[in-house]
Structures are given as structure tokens and as C-alpha cells.
Amino acid sequence: MYQTRKIGVVGQGHVGAHVANSLLMQGIADELYLCDINEAKVTSEVQDLRDSLSFVPYNTKIVNCYDHYEELACCDVIVNAAGKVALAAGNRDGELFFTTDAARTFAKRIVDAGFDGIFVSISNPCDVVCTELWHLTGYDPKKIIGSGCGLDSARLRTEISKKVGVSPKSIDAYMIGEHGFSQLAAFKAATIAGKNLNELQAENPDKYAFDHMEVEELARKGGYVTYQGKQCTEYAVANSAARVCAAVLHNEHAVLSASTLMTGQSGEEGIFTSLPCVIGAEGVEEVYTLDLSEYELEGFHKSCQHIHDNIAQLDWWDTEAYDAK
């Protein structure tokens, strides 16, 4: 018997609305459940998507849940896109208090209603919100996936591609750590056709030599270049979230850079941050610890510390319970 694929999206701002549209256009879900505290906004988005049904691959059921979050409990995947983009104008940390407060209004309600699927969280600061979802609900951390550095890794591959003339799809390279200014490129582990970038640069410097720091910075700040011209980012992050949803629903066992709970990888634990993960129907199936240079390892620890520092700003957070986990 055919298994209906159901995806919920919490938050219908710039990003949440584009996530819903991307899922619809790619035919990833059979049913979409949209939530937002602004009833007029979510009603408009639902109507707009329904008006598109004649032009998309599959006939998708689109449900307006308003702020009735318990209605999402039937979903296989729930995307958390609650946020306020204006607060993140210069820094993703700008949404810290807004997004963590928002998560407190719905996360436990959804889990208590019987949700047994996968959370995909894209609200910023992504790693803090993911850690919070785990902390608030006691939910299986493998079933909480943050978009994290997934899009940043795509930006990194694009920038490397422009330097070396190889398709970004053929480049295996990752941004890791916090989804923010402290993230870093794991160049020591980056490969093309199974060969390390450093080896390729030594063999053919004319083609493969480039300034690693420059490329890392372009990947790190790519989202802000987009923001400067349109005061939001929407298409790429929406497609990145849809990619994670597809990996879950199709049980792909795909390797993607995502924010997941650290359980000792590279000496870090107790927070969510980005490393390459195997993602399938049960969520995060495996987390890869990369071979990092001393410089990269130090940067990874600093990046993780920034996440801890953000969590410390949340005065409602039960730090004793958090540390006990």
C-alpha cells in the first residue's frame, strides 16, 4: 500500500514559504501542513500554493493549520522555519531570543501530541535552536536535524569550482561547526575524484592552487551578500531544507553537512553543530569525524564554544539539566 508522505512547515515568512514552495515544485510531499501565528499570512500562502497545483508534478494536499501545532503530529517531517529575518540583518545570532522563544511555543506541544517523525530545523541560530528542541522535548536527537552548514558547504563547493574549473557536484568539501561567522572549511579532508585538494595542488599548482582563506570567507559570508541586495535569503536555503526532507523521505542514506548532536566527535559533546552526516528515514544514521589540521581543529573548538556562549545567554535555560544531558 502506498505510504502518504506528509511534511509540516512551521513559520511562513520568507524562508518558510519558499520551503513549502520548493517541496511542492519538486513533488517531495503528498501533503503539506502549514503553520504560522499570523492567520492571514498562512491563509494567503496556502491559497497561493493551491493555485499552483495545475502546474506542479503531483497533486499535493495543502492544509492550513494556523497555530494548531498539534495537527502536525501526523507528519513524517516537520520543518522549523520560525524566525524574523530583520533581526538577522548583520548576524544570524540576532534572532537568538526570538527563535528560541518561538520554539518554546510549539515544540513540546507537537511531541506531546504523538509526533514520531523527523524535525528539520532551519531557524537561526540553527545550532542553538536544535540543541533547544532536544532539551525542551527530550526527543531522540538523531531525529532532530539542523540545516546547519549544508548550504554553506554548497557555497564552498561553488567557490572552489570557480577556482579549479570542476563542477561543484564533483567536489567533496564541507563547512563545519556553527552555522554562523565562526564556521570553517575542512580543507584537509576536501577531495576531488578521491584525491585530496592538497595533493592536487602539489601536482598541478597552475590549475588547483588557490587562496584557501579567501574561498572560506566567500563561503562563510555568501548569505550576507544575498541579504545586502534583497534583505532576505530564501531560494537556496529553501532548497537546502527540501534536500534534507527528500533524503529522509526517500531513505537515501545521503551524506550531507548538517547540525547534529555531538557525542564526542573531535572532543565535542552536548551541543548540535555541523559535521558530515548520513541521513535517512530514521534521521541521522552516522556522523563522520573528519581528519582536521591543528588549525582546523582549534577553529572547530572555538566555533562550538560560540554555540555554548549563545546558550548561556538564555536565562530561562535550565543549565543543570542541560549539562546533565
Task: Describe each model-derived feature in a short phrase.
Residues 92-157:
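Rossmann-like NAD(P)(H) cofactor-binding subdomain of soluble oxidoreductases
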Residues 16-17:
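N-terminal Rossmann-fold NAD(P) dinucleotide-binding loop
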